[in-house]
Amino acid sequence: MKTGGAVQPVMDQAIFAHILFNELEGRFNGTNSEFRWEGQGWVGTDYDKLWIKSEGTLSKGAVDDGQQQFLYSRAVTTYFDLQGGLRSDIDSRPTRNWAAFGIQGLAPYFFDLELTGYVSGEGHLAAKLEASYDLLLTQRLILQPQVELNVYSKGDPARLVGAGFSDIDTGLRLRYEINRKFAPYIGVVYEGKFGQTANFARRAGDSAGDVRFVFGVRTWF
């Protein structure tokens, strides 16, 4: 039986927006310090979204490891989206552009997971794995292990990147949520380089592996 009144909008077609900075932090060891950012934002519906992702490191007055991604995503399951678009490596070294294809979502046991493959205009291949997990110690105190791993099919000496497993960035952060949208944190991270990438770093006068203490904030809106 039909009822009177206006037709209600379908909520899964409503347009929303979200911005998250998971890392806004200073990284410190005994010899030098650096500033690291990692954030992403999207606008769209429950099924279709446009994404911007940005990450990089400011060290010694120069930007390193700068990556900007512009993606479209489509929900394919309750927990995962397929993504495709462009990645640009923009920092103090020569710019590189890639086509990007991957998945993002919640893996079993609610691990945040991003797995993305890349193809450059020269036919080079790359892949990135990012994973993290929020362990609630209390309603406000949260421990987050995190890992990022990069792989390249061919070396790029101009960007100090070698073929094979290139680098890892992994850490453990303890944050306190003053409110749901703002949480300062402390932690420790390990930045490691492998193989040719480690050799490039040493020749440039950098370390192939560093343990650093971090202080930062996580925020979203």
Residues of each region from the PLM?
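Transmembrane beta-barrel strands of outer-membrane/channel proteins
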Residues: 23-26, 52-56, 84-88, 115-119, ...
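Repeated loop/turn-to-beta-strand initiation elements of outer-membrane beta-barrel proteins
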Residues: 47-52, 78-82, 109-113, 138-143, ...
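Residues that define the transmembrane beta-barrel architecture of outer-membrane proteins
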Residues: 15-17, 33-37, 64-68, 95-99, ...
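Membrane-embedded beta-strands of outer-membrane beta-barrel proteins
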Residues: 39, 70, 101, 129-131, ...
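Residue-level signature of outer-membrane beta-barrel architecture
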Residues: 43-45, 74, 105, 119, ...
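Outer-membrane beta-barrel "beta-signal"
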Residues: 172-177, 208-221
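Detector for outer-membrane/organellar transmembrane beta-barrel domains
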Residues: 95-157
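Outer-membrane beta-barrel initiation region
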Residues: 1-62, 66, 70-74, 213
